[in-house]
């Protein structure tokens, strides 16, 4: 059962459909008693979704299973838990293996050193736990067409050089296609990564009807050539390469990586 939108003045940092999908992925762990941390929690919209549902179902305080952290904890507004400050060097303020699940919704595209960020997620998750990381899907067809004619993917625009104020750029400084997100997570140490998606865009489906046959043929030729030149690369990346031109990847708004330690 999906959560209802948070009925408060706490603002989400990601689309409602992304919150709903990650909520659906997280709640089975929460119901099993898992410890969860919301990394880059913003004002606490997603934390409130999880915390309020947990409290309603169990009668227990949200802080028994849920934690949150952010670079700017002073803006956190959900009173069910506290928000811990992320350290100045970007490290998370938790011991190794402190959580069963680390969630990060639409944060990684704001991060300068994404490899350091995924290593921190790996560090704070226990063996057998998961990291759930969402980001705008720059591989959907809307984004690919926009990049073709403008040089910029969807949700990523030219940046104001004279200001570091994230209000001028929405903080989107580092687009990461799914392959490179999965690569970073695997390099951090996670043993497997799977792709999930939030909502599928009608406009991207229309583009798929027109471009689908061409993409299928061209990608098949690319894979064949890669298999001849670099068979070891194909073997190591087979699952990620298969996902890149799936119908879901070509049509979804955001992509969500679930990485298992």
Residue ranges and their predicted role:
Residues 23-27, 34-146, 177, 182, ...:
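Conserved SAM-binding loop
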Residues 7-17, 45, 49, 85, ...:
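S-adenosyl-L-methionine-dependent methyltransferase catalytic module, highlighting the catalytic core
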Residues 1-30:
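Conserved class I S-adenosyl-L-methionine
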Residues 29-32, 251:
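Flexible, charged surface loops at secondary-structure boundaries
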